[in-house]
Amino acid sequence: MSILIRIINYSLSLRPNIVNTIIMKITKALLTLGLASAMMQSTAQTAGGAGMSEPRQNPLLMKSTLPFGAPDFRKIQSSDYIPAIEAAIHLQRSKVADIVNNKQAPTFQNTIVAFDESGALLGRVSNILFALASADKTPEIAEAEKQAMPMLTALENDIVFNKALFQRVKYVYDHQHRSLKGEDKKLLEEVYQKFVHAGALLSGEKASRLQEINLRIADLQQQWGDLLPDATNHAVVWVDSKDELAGLSEADIAQCRQDAESRGSKAPYAIVIINTTQQPILASLDNRDLRRRVYEASIHRSDGTRGFNTFPLVAEIAKLRAEQGELMGQKNYASYSLENTMAKTPENIYAFLRQLIQGYTPKADAETKAIEEFARRTEGSDFKLEPYDRFYYSAKMKKEMLNISDDEVKPYFNVDSVQKNGVFYAAHRVYGLNFVERKDIPTYHPDMKVFEVQDRDGKPIALFYSDMFRRPTKRGGAWMSEFAKQSTYRQQLPIIYNVCNSAKAPAGQPSLLTWDEVTTMFHEFGHALHGILSNCKYNMLSGTDVARDFVEMPSQFNESFASIPEIFDHYAKHAVTGKPMPADLKERMLKSINFQTAYSLGENLAATCLDLAWHVLPSKDVPTADKAADFETKALKEIGLLNHQIPPRYSTSYFNHVWGGGYAAGYYSYLWTEVLAVNIADCFAKRGALKPEVGQAFRDKVLSRGNTGDLMKMFSDFTGMKQPDASALLPARGL
């Protein structure tokens, strides 16, 4: 993966924009470098006289006066982004030229640190732009993103293939690597390896071709980023009468009415399609034909059936990536992409997956058989269970066996209580953190909230933004990212945000969550903690800037706190009465967490294998767009995961993690890091899950360290284990 594409699209659950490789932080030399004109992007009338005007300073190019250096969204306009990007690119080019033209011998300080600092302004500006491009993509923001992408990719190419710059980096690596210690040594290694991995050792035609590929992939991913959200928005299922929504709660029906109103009211009600294959609403819909319509809208959203077709983009991206791998001396893209991960090779990942598939398959078959038998007992012996029936009869089966349903527990999962009395409370108990809402700090959308994060001694350590509710301008999924990464060298505290896609209740009503949405909030805040608790010297090494197959560990581990009784009891309170969840309901609900979990494992295994199947192909074998769907079927069949009842969590045509995000040949990392998370959760349970000293040890040995050391050693230092224990995964899922 090219450096810039990873910067812009590397999502956490998906979850984007977390790795700043060549784009770093703030410098002071704007005006002295002749950039004053770029900062004056619009004009305003002065009070002095008619016809007079004074330049308006671009707020993106000015150091923020807000606490923590937070973005001042009161001042930023959509028209500010491109002039700011252009000025910041110009500044980084000047900084790189200064490094190259330095007459002194290359040193760690005048080359490596200087390079780490060279993109500071561009990092600040692009972090804000790409945050909005994912979470509040108005037409103006979409246009700014479209214009920015080719400029940024061209900059990346110019830096990566700047032979004079790389020679200085290589000189430092060759002459100072042995003498440097700690984070200095790690930064040198990371900078050198990133240049090499991006193609700096290539020359001639190979280097030129790789630059062409980088530019083309950036363009294709921009097209994907426009097309898929549009396709998903158009996949909305319109419903003419309330009777068709039988089975939904009144709150869910009100949400369907509100969704229809926000999308033009083509019918009184609308069912919005989310990013995954299966749609949670199918668990409640009594109308089988409507269930079918919703499911088909999901799986056909972007395969050409309904006018939106991403397969041409998929085929070209896959072929170009395969060529990237070959140019870099590997047999395919996956082998190239995995070089600097914990897994190392596709073969290691396939061995890991086959171990899981072997244990999973009989459990999945038994689970499917049980649901089929239940459905036939309900509907008749000739009833044929379809994928759109799965959630519905599974929910009914759970209701019969455990006497529990989502509608029964949702009133106890008010989004505000889950966040403040659950997510924040767990962080307080485990890490000593406190959260103070800052209503004085502006946001890019009125639904957002901002919190100052304070350590146990009351000292501010981070700023945290929360953007919980779905809207037409927000892409699907949930993620963590940052406006600024932590760095002691820059004296910068982290500015972190979480984005989710929960339904916002009509005015005057509480916004309620499903259990899955509750765990999503804990998951994303696990990523946030990785950034909030970072205590690293250099920006490039801090927070979540770690290997993909490690980055999901803190988030998946943090999910474990959602069901710990002391935490659960603190947030699971009725949204109207404030009373805690009754003991019998709580017992039934917690027992239901692992009910029929073979499905969730199977859909993730299928998606993971799809991702790998596309990226282990040599360029000559990548299928054309018209053969892409057939390739998906063949790939799943060969690995033993072609299951009509358990489709991939993301099918090829809407697999945003892979084609629009930073998880190409990397979706396996969710399962890989789930093993790490299970092992760590076991350690917490044995030592005392809510004991501050246990949390402090995890904070000191893992969360605070970013990418400053060997990741496996961090894991081992905390757990005492030499290697992760994959056998713990299936039991942890109740399988």
Predicted features and spans:
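Short His/Asp/Glu-rich catalytic/ion-coordination signatures at enzyme active sites or charged loops
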Residues: T65-D80, L129-A148, Y171-E212, V272-P312, ...
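Bacterial Sec-dependent N-terminal signal peptides
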Residues: M1-A50
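Short pre-active-site segment immediately N-terminal to the catalytic Zn-binding motif
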Residues: A505-M521
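Intrinsically disordered or highly flexible coil/loop and linker segments, enriched in small
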Residues: M39, H90, S94, D98-A105, ...
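Short, hydrophobic/amphipathic alpha-helical patches that form generic packing surfaces
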Residues: L121-A131, Q193, E296, R390-K398, ...
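N-terminal helix-rich structural modules
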Residues: T46, G51-C256, F684
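Active-site-proximal, well-structured secondary-structure segments within enzyme catalytic domains
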Residues: L187, D219, D226, A231-I271, ...
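C-terminal, non-catalytic "cap/extension" segments appended to globular domains
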Residues: M52-K75, D80, A87, P268-A270, ...
